[in-house]
């Protein structure tokens, strides 16, 4: 990944933001007890998860094969977290940012790490339609506070050089990989690209990416359009990564674990047809044809009651295949027929 960051080309997110100017908070993922370290719920625990398989800490770049060189080689000891409450971690300290405007400013610049963000865009993000009369002075004051926070937590050789004022804007001069959102996008895209050929490695990458989450993305970054648009994008990619993870588990023959995950996800996201489809196939594969058909009936009822629509063509096709006991349902790679190709990677730089 080069200097483009999370939104290496901003067009996709700008379109999203413009089409949904009032994007709100994200729904919370399934499971609320804060105990399970499963990828669905690891970010609800409020701590860095460790993989049950290897014991590696996955909140930081412990495995070069997953993340490349140590994060602390990228941006002078600074790691900015946006997959949850906004925070700054370094090799010697870390924590959140108390001041709301400073937090929003750091988050907005982190979304475009390595790229300048214009003064106009920053003003819009911090104040929206009601900027103060002395808005540029106010922005400079918040930038000075943000620079102070970053400098206090950076290693000595980078102190003073992370947040820069450039012509017409500000720049967070760190490698995009120092932002957890970028690492998440990279990992889950790499994992999806391995399907269906290497489901074991795909599971490792997808789980590692999903465990970077500590809560809803950019949850405390304010209501500006850039942060809310990016948060909506991250949430969609998180759900897609969960779909890919479950498909990879099916490819490895892990139906029992996948079914348990899917039952939680269907309860949490009852209108997301892909989760229901995967659950139906999983139930059928373990000999629970009746439960698979009941899952379809419930999904159809929810869609009709809440949206007044019928299930989509793919869900209806799965229903017909289950009724007919179609042998295709037992084929390991059946779930990877078009249109379920690996997740789009156009948001990542080459």
Swiss-Prot record:
The keyword Transcription regulation applies. GO terms for biological process: antibiotic biosynthetic process; phosphorelay signal transduction system; regulation of DNA-templated transcription. Keywords: Antibiotic biosynthesis, DNA-binding, Transcription, Transcription regulation, Two-component regulatory system. It comes from the Bacteria. GO terms for molecular function: DNA binding. Residues 69-174 bind DNA. The keyword Transcription regulation applies. The RedD protein is probably one of several delicately balanced regulatory factors that contribute to the control of the biosynthesis of the antibiotic undecylprodigiosin (Red) in S.coelicolor. Belongs to the AfsR/DnrI/RedD regulatory family. PANTHER family: TRANSCRIPTIONAL REGULATOR REDD, TRANSCRIPTIONAL REGULATOR REDD-RELATED. This is Transcriptional regulator RedD. It comes from Streptomyces coelicolor (strain ATCC BAA-471 / A3(2) / M145). The lineage of its organism: Bacteria, Bacillati, Actinomycetota, Actinomycetes, Kitasatosporales.
């Amino acid at each position: 990944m080069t200097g483009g960051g999370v939104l290496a080309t901003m067009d996709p997110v700008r379109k999203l933001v413009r089409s949904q100017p009032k994007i709100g908070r994200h729904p919370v993922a399934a499971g609320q007890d804060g105990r399970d370290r499963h990828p669905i719920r690891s970010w609800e625990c409020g701590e860095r998860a460790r993989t049950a398989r290897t014991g590696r800490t996955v909140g930081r770049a412990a495995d070069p094969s997953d993340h490349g060189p140590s994060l602390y080689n990228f941006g002078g000891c600074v790691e900015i977290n946006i997959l949850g409450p906004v925070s700054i971690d370094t090799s010697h300290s870390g924590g959140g940012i108390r001041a709301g405007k400073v937090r929003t400013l750091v988050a907005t610049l982190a979304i475009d790490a390595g790229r300048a963000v214009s003064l106009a865009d920053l003003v819009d993000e911090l104040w929206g339609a009601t900027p103060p009369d002395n808005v540029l002075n106010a922005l400079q004051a918040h930038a000075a506070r943000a620079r102070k926070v970053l400098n206090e937590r950076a290693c000595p050789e980078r102190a003073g050089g992370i947040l820069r004022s450039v012509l017409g804007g500000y720049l967070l001069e760190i490698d995009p990989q120092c932002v957890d959102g970028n690492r998440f996008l990279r990992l889950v895209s790499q994992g999806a690209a391995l399907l269906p050929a290497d489901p074991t490695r795909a599971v490792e990458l997808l789980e590692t990416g999903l465990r970077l989450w500590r809560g809803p993305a950019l949850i405390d970054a304010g209501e500006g359009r850039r942060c809310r648009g990016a948060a909506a994008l991250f949430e969609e990619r998180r759900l897609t990564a969960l779909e890919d993870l479950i498909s990879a588990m099916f490819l490895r023959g892990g139906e029992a674990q996948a079914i348990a995950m899917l039952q939680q996800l269907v309860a949490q996201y009852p209108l997301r047809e892909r989760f229901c489809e995967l659950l139906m196939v999983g139930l059928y594969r373990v000999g629970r044809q009746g439960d698979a058909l009941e899952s379809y009936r419930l999904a159809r009822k929810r869609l009709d009651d809440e949206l007044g629509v019928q299930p989509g063509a793919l869900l209806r096709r799965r229903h017909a295949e289950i009724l007919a006991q179609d042998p295709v349902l037992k084929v390991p790679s059946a779930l990877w027929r078009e249109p379920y190709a690996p997740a789009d990677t156009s948001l990542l730089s080459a």
